[in-house]
């Protein structure tokens, strides 16, 4: 473990999970664009006459095809326009809270009149947005980097009006701190942390269960959840916990990707990852009638493992973080919930990695529900297999000598192996933009 005391590590991990586990309305990439524009507008007198957006390729890929909340339209240009019209930066990840038909009509008019431009930019942090707002008198440049609401700099008429202190220092500390831990360390912290500190975990469980219920009722996104439920009711799918996790996780993603206004608790800064971590663990907990406290700890463990994996793969990457990183978090939480020790927890993770490594990210959109549903059911199955001593052997394929080695291999694959693949995927998925 780190040179810090166990108590300090526990508090730092808790702080990190709280920071990366917050409610959001809508996909967080369009949210980041709208939030950046809305923040810049605060520094401007009068109306916004022109918005020039520059975004990282990952923001572009993950934001172009997902429906904006309370609308039936997609696009980062629309997101930017709405941020300038009705976005409130004080709302953070709820920046789309005030969107209505009148504001949407105004945003569409801005797009029609070419008020908003959108271009990708190279060699930036995966989470990067630069919004240049021009009015009658003022020009404001707002820069977001490293997090979906992390404003780094505001420049007003050529002068710096705001600059964040110690740029990236906290992120680097968090990254170093997480990489010093083992899965065993995280498991021990999960078991020892005071349950009184985990109230926010229960909030996320209830929030995402409600989102899944709404997703089953409303015709949003791909409507995969309700379609799977229909198949189950017709006797074509079972009623086991893996299938229920598949249905509910798909339904939550349908709602989120389809522009639903229901808030969703994120994990690692992503709503889909929040759904994929929380719902499968909750389904298994309800199936085995686990105590509330054990459910809370299992979900906390899932969030922590998801964040641990993402410190190697990156916040946004060429692989599907929702299916892989969040799925790994879910299976770890389930294995622990079922009474698994380190061998079984690690085994469940290895089973998931042997199964789903290579699932690429081709952008946020309605069909993300398919990937999430696959990951949710496989997370349940992988944990039960590990509990029955069915575990992929070490040093086979991507599987290394330990679970930590394997996660490091995944990170190498993402950053070194899939870097070019991400560019190719961007050219395929975003050819009409770039």
UniProtKB/Swiss-Prot annotation:
The lineage of its organism: Bacteria, Bacillati, Bacillota, Clostridia, Eubacteriales. Belongs to the UPF0597 family. This is UPF0597 protein CLI_2075. One of its GO terms (molecular function) is L-cysteine desulfhydrase activity. GO terms for biological process: L-cysteine catabolic process to pyruvate. It comes from the Bacteria. It comes from Clostridium botulinum (strain Langeland / NCTC 10281 / Type F). PANTHER family: UPF0597 PROTEIN YHAM. HAMAP family: UPF0597 (MF_01845).
